[in-house]
Amino acid sequence: AGKVILESGMIKSVRHISFINIRLSHQVKGCCKKVLPYIINGNETFHTLIISPPRCGKTTLLRDMIRMLSDGFPGFKGNTIGVVDERSEIGACYKGVPQNDIGIRTDILDCCPKSYGMLMLIRSMSPQIIAVDEIGSRDDIDAIYSVINCGCKLIATVHGNSIDDIRNRPGLRKLVDERVFERYIVLSNRKRTGEIRTIFDDRGSVLFMAEDERLTSAYENEAAVAELS
């Protein structure tokens, strides 16, 4: 943190640095096993959106989903996956080589803007699945429509506490209303980081709900289902 220097309306650098936040990417292998039965159909994957506040494990979950869907597992043949890693948080690449295990059938574009990277992968890498972290901009939304209309499956993450939060953001609301995503995974850290609260389908049906969620958030979930229906 410090003083941000602008040039022609764009951020050029930061001076008078007062604090440094060092983030270390790490893996939790196997953390996605609970959600896999809800996001696959035969040997295909549903368009999936992971919803989570900061520091609740959405990138960690996404990374492990990429690894397992790429490698494959009993009953599921591995898929080719293209990853756009805009902030180097998924693969933690060094000189283009992922330091995290993201699967044997995974291609990664490191430090590439998501909107450009998704289109590049479609045109040149023939992925079955495209995975991106933290969508939200108008350019991201436009690229997402290109992905889903070319036969690729999409797995993405977004900041938020619930589906209601997503619907309050105009670009993302359109994705929900048009049922672009077929699965919604909502995370929290009430008990532990990466806790899976609920999993919805595109019609608003609850496929999974944590036991404590049934008691503490029943009204919230009913409202979310009503909004999607």
What spans do the regions from the language model cover?
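P-loop NTP-binding catalytic core
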Residues: 1-45
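Conserved nucleotide-binding/hydrolysis micro-motifs of P-loop NTPases
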Residues: 4-6, 27, 45, 87-91, ...
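A general structural motif
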Residues: 29-34, 108-116, 135
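Conserved catalytic network of the ASCE P-loop NTPase/AAA+ motor domain
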Residues: 41-43, 53-54, 71-76, 98-101, ...
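Glycine-rich phosphate-binding P-loop
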Residues: 45-67
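Conserved P-loop NTPase nucleotide-binding/switch module
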Residues: 125-185, 189
